[in-house]
Regions:
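Extracellular polysaccharide-recognition and catalytic grooves
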Residues: 5-175
Length: 175
Protein backbone atom coordinates (compact mmCIF):
# COMPACT_ATOMS: atom_id res chain seq x y z
CA UNK A 1 0.00 0.00 0.00
CA UNK A 2 2.85 2.40 0.76
CA UNK A 3 4.54 1.85 -2.59
CA UNK A 4 1.24 2.36 -4.41
CA UNK A 5 0.64 5.61 -2.54
CA UNK A 6 4.18 6.86 -3.21
CA UNK A 7 3.99 5.89 -6.89
CA UNK A 8 0.67 7.71 -7.31
CA UNK A 9 2.19 10.84 -5.80
CA UNK A 10 5.34 10.68 -7.92
CA UNK A 11 3.44 10.01 -11.12
CA UNK A 12 1.67 13.36 -10.97
CA UNK A 13 4.43 15.45 -9.44
CA UNK A 14 5.00 18.05 -12.16
CA UNK A 15 8.14 19.56 -10.61
CA UNK A 16 10.11 16.75 -12.26
CA UNK A 17 9.51 18.50 -15.55
CA UNK A 18 11.30 21.69 -14.48
CA UNK A 19 13.74 20.65 -11.75
CA UNK A 20 17.29 19.32 -11.92
CA UNK A 21 17.79 16.47 -14.35
CA UNK A 22 18.73 13.95 -11.67
CA UNK A 23 15.15 14.01 -10.35
CA UNK A 24 13.80 13.17 -13.81
CA UNK A 25 16.21 10.28 -14.07
CA UNK A 26 15.76 8.83 -10.60
CA UNK A 27 11.99 9.15 -10.86
CA UNK A 28 11.96 7.42 -14.25
CA UNK A 29 13.57 4.43 -12.52
CA UNK A 30 11.12 4.66 -9.60
CA UNK A 31 8.19 4.72 -12.03
CA UNK A 32 9.52 1.73 -13.97
CA UNK A 33 10.04 -0.32 -10.82
CA UNK A 34 6.66 0.71 -9.38
CA UNK A 35 4.91 -0.17 -12.62
CA UNK A 36 6.44 -3.63 -12.64
CA UNK A 37 5.84 -4.28 -8.96
CA UNK A 38 2.25 -3.02 -8.98
CA UNK A 39 1.46 -4.24 -12.51
CA UNK A 40 0.43 -0.71 -13.50
CA UNK A 41 1.53 0.20 -17.03
CA UNK A 42 0.75 3.92 -16.58
CA UNK A 43 3.64 4.20 -14.10
CA UNK A 44 6.01 2.68 -16.61
CA UNK A 45 4.73 5.10 -19.25
CA UNK A 46 5.44 8.03 -16.93
CA UNK A 47 8.93 6.62 -16.46
CA UNK A 48 9.44 6.59 -20.23
CA UNK A 49 8.28 10.22 -20.46
CA UNK A 50 10.71 11.33 -17.77
CA UNK A 51 13.54 9.32 -19.34
CA UNK A 52 12.94 11.07 -22.66
CA UNK A 53 13.06 14.48 -20.99
CA UNK A 54 16.28 13.49 -19.26
CA UNK A 55 17.91 12.30 -22.47
CA UNK A 56 17.30 15.76 -23.92
CA UNK A 57 19.91 16.89 -21.37
CA UNK A 58 22.67 14.66 -22.77
CA UNK A 59 25.02 16.38 -25.18
CA UNK A 60 26.27 14.62 -28.29
CA UNK A 61 29.58 13.94 -26.50
CA UNK A 62 27.83 12.36 -23.52
CA UNK A 63 27.95 15.22 -21.02
CA UNK A 64 24.85 15.39 -18.85
CA UNK A 65 23.66 18.95 -18.31
CA UNK A 66 20.72 20.21 -16.31
CA UNK A 67 21.85 20.30 -12.68
CA UNK A 68 20.73 23.85 -12.04
CA UNK A 69 18.73 26.64 -13.59
CA UNK A 70 17.94 26.82 -16.37
CA UNK A 71 17.82 23.04 -16.70
CA UNK A 72 17.60 23.01 -20.48
CA UNK A 73 18.99 26.42 -21.30
CA UNK A 74 21.91 28.74 -20.83
CA UNK A 75 22.81 31.14 -18.05
CA UNK A 76 23.08 34.87 -18.85
CA UNK A 77 26.80 34.23 -19.46
CA UNK A 78 26.13 31.35 -21.86
CA UNK A 79 26.92 28.50 -19.47
CA UNK A 80 25.12 25.20 -18.92
CA UNK A 81 24.42 23.87 -15.41
CA UNK A 82 26.64 20.81 -14.88
CA UNK A 83 27.49 18.74 -11.84
CA UNK A 84 30.01 16.08 -12.84
CA UNK A 85 30.01 14.49 -9.40
CA UNK A 86 26.26 14.17 -9.14
CA UNK A 87 26.11 12.94 -12.72
CA UNK A 88 28.59 10.18 -11.89
CA UNK A 89 27.17 9.27 -8.49
CA UNK A 90 23.42 9.71 -8.89
CA UNK A 91 22.06 10.44 -12.35
CA UNK A 92 24.04 8.12 -14.61
CA UNK A 93 23.89 5.14 -12.23
CA UNK A 94 20.09 5.51 -12.09
CA UNK A 95 19.88 5.86 -15.86
CA UNK A 96 21.98 2.74 -16.42
CA UNK A 97 19.77 0.88 -13.92
CA UNK A 98 16.73 2.02 -15.91
CA UNK A 99 18.35 0.82 -19.15
CA UNK A 100 19.02 -2.64 -17.71
CA UNK A 101 15.62 -2.83 -16.00
CA UNK A 102 13.88 -2.10 -19.32
CA UNK A 103 16.40 -4.07 -21.41
CA UNK A 104 16.80 -1.01 -23.66
CA UNK A 105 19.92 -1.76 -25.70
CA UNK A 106 20.04 1.66 -27.35
CA UNK A 107 19.83 3.38 -23.97
CA UNK A 108 22.54 1.10 -22.58
CA UNK A 109 24.90 2.27 -25.33
CA UNK A 110 23.93 5.91 -24.80
CA UNK A 111 24.58 5.68 -21.07
CA UNK A 112 27.86 3.82 -21.57
CA UNK A 113 29.01 6.67 -23.80
CA UNK A 114 28.07 9.15 -21.08
CA UNK A 115 29.78 7.09 -18.38
CA UNK A 116 32.93 6.96 -20.50
CA UNK A 117 32.84 10.72 -21.09
CA UNK A 118 32.45 11.43 -17.39
CA UNK A 119 35.42 9.19 -16.54
CA UNK A 120 37.59 12.05 -17.78
CA UNK A 121 36.85 13.66 -14.43
CA UNK A 122 37.96 10.71 -12.32
CA UNK A 123 41.42 11.13 -10.87
CA UNK A 124 43.95 8.30 -10.97
CA UNK A 125 43.14 7.15 -7.45
CA UNK A 126 39.37 7.02 -8.07
CA UNK A 127 38.39 10.42 -6.68
CA UNK A 128 36.03 12.55 -8.75
CA UNK A 129 36.92 16.14 -9.59
CA UNK A 130 33.74 18.04 -8.89
CA UNK A 131 35.48 21.34 -8.19
CA UNK A 132 33.25 23.22 -10.63
CA UNK A 133 30.04 21.24 -10.10
CA UNK A 134 26.85 23.00 -9.09
CA UNK A 135 26.99 21.10 -5.79
CA UNK A 136 30.73 21.42 -5.13
CA UNK A 137 29.98 22.89 -1.69
CA UNK A 138 28.96 19.46 -0.41
CA UNK A 139 31.64 17.44 -2.14
CA UNK A 140 34.37 15.50 -0.38
CA UNK A 141 37.41 13.84 -1.88
CA UNK A 142 35.68 10.45 -1.96
CA UNK A 143 32.35 11.80 -3.27
CA UNK A 144 29.15 13.50 -2.29
CA UNK A 145 27.46 13.36 1.07
CA UNK A 146 24.02 13.03 -0.57
CA UNK A 147 24.40 10.65 -3.50
CA UNK A 148 24.70 6.89 -3.86
CA UNK A 149 28.17 6.67 -5.37
CA UNK A 150 29.37 5.81 -8.85
CA UNK A 151 30.13 2.14 -8.24
CA UNK A 152 26.76 0.59 -9.11
CA UNK A 153 26.44 2.48 -12.38
CA UNK A 154 29.93 1.65 -13.55
CA UNK A 155 29.69 -1.97 -12.43
CA UNK A 156 26.39 -2.53 -14.25
CA UNK A 157 27.96 -1.26 -17.47
CA UNK A 158 31.33 -3.00 -16.98
CA UNK A 159 30.51 -6.18 -18.89
CA UNK A 160 31.83 -4.79 -22.19
CA UNK A 161 33.94 -2.00 -20.67
CA UNK A 162 36.57 -3.33 -18.24
CA UNK A 163 37.71 0.23 -17.53
CA UNK A 164 34.36 0.80 -15.80
CA UNK A 165 34.98 -2.00 -13.34
CA UNK A 166 38.46 -0.68 -12.61
CA UNK A 167 37.05 2.82 -12.03
CA UNK A 168 34.41 1.52 -9.63
CA UNK A 169 37.04 -0.42 -7.67
CA UNK A 170 39.34 2.60 -7.42
CA UNK A 171 36.50 4.79 -6.20
CA UNK A 172 35.37 2.17 -3.69
CA UNK A 173 38.90 1.89 -2.31
CA UNK A 174 38.71 5.54 -1.24
CA UNK A 175 36.05 4.75 1.34
Amino acid sequence: ARIAKAAAYLEHYKEFEVCNVNYRITNSLAMELSGKLLNEEHYRERGRQLKKMALDCLTEDGLLIGEGKPVDGFSPKGCRPVDIGYNMEESLPSLVQYAYETDDEKLKETVKKALKYHLKFMLGDGAIDNSFGTRNYKWTYWGSRTSDGCMLGYLLAAEDEPVFGAAAKKNLNLL
